[in-house]
């Protein structure tokens, strides 16, 4: 009988231990969503802060790039800018004439009487 009584006490203690572990696990399960929400909130806040920092850094980099470009490539004098505009207009005008030749589909484009079509056109445009 003593052995049954001892066994009963041992089982009772084990039961209490299991019940206390269960209670502890239930409390952890209840606290886990709260902890996860806190973790998500802190992650969201950190992500927003990182985004603001990145936007600020990007603006600083763009400003530095613009500053360097103006130092490296100052504005052209108006005469040079006008010549550049005339040059690119001339190039765009002659592209269709030369395109087929460059692709190997047509003969060399015919030039003006003196042999250089560009020499005739550029002074005329500069006078306009």
Curated annotation (Swiss-Prot):
It is found in: Cell projection, Cilium. It holds the Pfam family CEP15-like. The keyword Nucleotide-binding does not apply. The keyword Zinc does not apply. GO terms for cellular component: cilium. Keywords: Cell projection. May play a role in ciliary assembly. This is Centrosomal protein 15.
């Amino acid at each position: 009988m003593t052995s049954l009584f001892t066994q009963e006490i041992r089982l009772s203690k084990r039961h209490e231990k299991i019940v206390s572990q269960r209670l502890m696990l239930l409390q952890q399960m209840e606290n886990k969503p709260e902890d996860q929400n806190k973790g998500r909130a802190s992650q969201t806040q950190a992500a927003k802060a990182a985004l603001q920092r990145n936007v600020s850094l990007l603006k600083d980099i763009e400003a530095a790039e613009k500053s360097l470009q103006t130092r490296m490539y100052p504005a052209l004098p108006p005469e040079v800018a006008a010549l550049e505009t005339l040059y690119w207009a001339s190039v765009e005008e002659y592209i269709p004439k030369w395109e087929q030749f460059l692709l190997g589909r047509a003969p060399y484009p015919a030039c003006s009487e003196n042999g250089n079509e560009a020499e005739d056109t550029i002074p005329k445009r500069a006078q306009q």
